[in-house]
Amino acid sequence: MINQENNDLYDLNEALQVENLTLNDYEEICKRLKKKPNRTELGMFGVMWSEHCCYRNSKPLLSKFPTKGKNVLVGPGENAGVIDVGNNQKLVFKIESHNHPSAIEPFQGAATGVGGILRDIFTMGARPIAVLNSLRFGNLDKSSNVDLLRGVVSGIAHYGNCVGVPTVGGEIDFDDSYSGNPLVNVMALGLLETEEIVCSGAKNVGSPVLYVGNTTGRDGVGGASFASSELTTTSLDDRPAVQVGDPFVEKSLIEACLDAFKTGDVIAAQDMGAAGLTCSSAEMAANGNLGISIDLDLVPSREDDMSSYQYLLSESQERMLFVVKEEKINDLIEKFNKWGLYASVIGEVIGTNEVIISHKGKIVAQIPTSALSDDTPVNFHNVINNPPDDLLNKWEWKENDLPEIHEQKIFSLKENKKFSFQEIILKLLSNPSIASKRWIYKQYDSQVQANTVFKPGKSDAAVVRLREQYKKNKSKVFSGVAASVDCNSRWVALDPFRGSIAAVAESARNVSCVGAEPVAITNNLNFSSPESEIGYWQLSSSCNGITEACKALETPVTGGNVSLYNESKNKDNLITPINPTPVIGMVGKIDNIEKAISCEWKNIDDQIWLIGSYKSDTTIAASSYLEYFHGEITGRPPKIDLLDEKFCQSFLRNAILNSLVVSSHDISDGGLAIALAESCILSAKGATIELKKDINREDNLLFAEGGSRIIFSINKIKQNEWLNYLKQNQINFPSSVYVKKIGHVSSETLKINIQDKNICNIRVEELSEKFNNSISDYF
């Protein structure tokens, strides 16, 4: 037992287990403090030294990312990244995860995930203008996964709809690896409303520290430590570690904070997210190279007899911490009270670099700021030199391993019978990972604020008008921003390096497909335990891939989130890790949103074209077709030639800006056939496609993935203009990039011919039925 001067008795081994700390950590803490920590101090170290707060396992890998660029104003280190989007406007954006809380309390876990990322945005002085989400669940044939999906979607919808921020897009995938550990990643965008970016570093010794927002309770205590450990069969007992959100308080907080920031009387701001008051005070002090003292007796609370430990580790929602001008404190408190928010001076900035906490007249914690924030432990791991043997074996897979095609039919290794290509297209369209997510996004308010250009599902990336709502300017606003979240986790599982390159490339491609220029990314690295040899190799390889792609595409990393220990343990102590899932949130700028285009065909007889790269692999390996039709997750994912990728995107964007291209859609899950079908479904128009059999297998032509490929349509009245444009630009084409006409838009049927033989003739109505009802049928 440890006995401290404040009679704080605790069992050391039990306390270390609760705080997810090691004995080595404890010895290091004693060295930093030059004494043994009391229970409150140990709890503060527990959350601040967790992976969630200090990235102790991933920090060496994150340092490789490119973080500077011509448009980047604020990179990693602040609450969110900031880029210049022109016209004296600044976009603030970030992605965060709420995986473990959503696993045990899906509604509140997802809802507070939305609330937390919104606070990161408006803490910088920006009004939130859009939310996107990237979700992963186990397959829906298991009822518990259906319940998780229902709860998470309801939570996102509830919070986003009530707070008045549109949910404009996202992605969702289903795989058994997520059955015990779903992923809930939320990305938010905001438009700066203040003259200066509001930063988090404390300034001016003696300045008051102001607490604003909701009261503090016991909900969410230890949430950061909980988020940094694996899920087990007893994780439901950790429900108190899940926060409870109130979107109506958040709405008041947004308006009050932006109002206060515009006065210039707020010196620094930090939201109370993970690790609550501990993290916000420590980071403000460290970022300002000063200290902070706090009296917990002054903190507005909603429960009686809370301990100092509970005050400091509570993750009650909708709370902020400010450093403010002393002479303006009364004006600010009055402003916040007007919005129905609690506002109380709870401390001050001090000259010594430490966080000092008082409670009931006694100092209960006194810790150097560097020990909590800057100089936190780093766990170094050895990276294996070669990929695991099971992956090397899978990379040996060849398309010739599949059954031969006879009379336009192929034998399914999964279902042990033959199917026509027409039947395969319908089967792929009905797979929940490919099918329409309409059941999900119809629950979201995507039109609130009246700036959403395309409804969810209509375009490869969301497009939002950059209208400054606080200005009473009635002139029309043309500038906009595009955003997309992407990751093919099957590819990353089979090759973390190639798969992560592909995730960056696809997110940029989606942004380019609407006519926007990719500018920067935020990423959410969802991985299993870094203590596993393979788990850390996956994380390291993924970071290398992201680094290479971001450098080549000139899309620097402005920040993000790392979520490790995403694995579940069953009653037999068998661990199931998730597929590694590095979600890329890409943002791009577009000068004129009237030029932006969607995936839908526009006019009958418009020409359909295909652009792609011969250097970028086009293969059935690692494809949706191989998994969903043949039941095999194998093969090496396609290699992407990033120079060709960049050229294809740039060429397409310029054609869109010249009003020649009227629709475009990237080829991803399911290959060319599914991309064509989706454009048909979205427009309720057909397509007649003529393909040459320049390879041995028809299923490669139809269902192969990769190749940096995009289908697009040319307005029928601009076909000569398009051909002239193409001829003028042909001289700049790399020899490995091709652009070819493959068909035209028709009325009611998707008709695909290969070498003049018809292999598909499906009415759009039948395509739509399979595509639109797959997920909703589970409810």
From Swiss-Prot:
This enzyme's EC code(s): 6.3.5.3
Catalytic activity: N(2)-formyl-N(1)-(5-phospho-beta-D-ribosyl)glycinamide + L-glutamine + ATP + H2O = 2-formamido-N(1)-(5-O-phospho-beta-D-ribosyl)acetamidine + L-glutamate + ADP + phosphate + H(+)
Subcellular locations according to the entry: Cytoplasm
Alphabetical keyword list: ATP-binding, Cytoplasm, Ligase, Magnesium, Metal-binding, Nucleotide-binding, Purine biosynthesis
Enzyme class: ligase
Cellular component GO terms held in the UniProt record: cytoplasm
Single Gene Ontology BP annotation: 'de novo' IMP biosynthetic process
Catalytic-site annotation from UniProt: H52, H98 (proton acceptor)
Pathway(s) annotated for this protein in UniProt: Purine metabolism; IMP biosynthesis via de novo pathway; 5-amino-1-(5-phospho-D-ribosyl)imidazole from N(2)-formyl-N(1)-(5-phospho-D-ribosyl)glycinamide: step 1/2
Predominant cellular place of this UniProt entry's protein: cytoplasm
InterPro entries: PRibForGlyAmidine_synth_PurL, PurL_linker, PurM-like_C_dom, PurM-like_C_sf, PurM-like_N, PurM-like_N_sf
Binding-site residues, Mg(2+) 2: D120, D271
SUPFAM superfamilies xrefs: PurM C-terminal domain-like, PurM N-terminal domain-like
Assembly description: Monomer. Part of the FGAM synthase complex composed of 1 PurL, 1 PurQ and 2 PurS subunits.
Entry's family note: Belongs to the FGAMS family.
NCBIfam families for the chain: FGAM_synth_II, PRK01213.1
Biological role: Part of the phosphoribosylformylglycinamidine synthase complex involved in the purines biosynthetic pathway. Catalyzes the ATP-dependent conversion of formylglycinamide ribonucleotide (FGAR) and glutamine to yield formylglycinamidine ribonucleotide (FGAM) and glutamate. The FGAM synthase complex is composed of three subunits. PurQ produces an ammonia molecule by converting glutamine to glutamate. PurL transfers the ammonia molecule to FGAR to form FGAM in an ATP-dependent manner.
Annotated protein name in UniProt: Phosphoribosylformylglycinamidine synthase subunit PurL
Species per Swiss-Prot/TrEMBL record: Prochlorococcus marinus (strain MIT 9301)
The encoding gene: purL
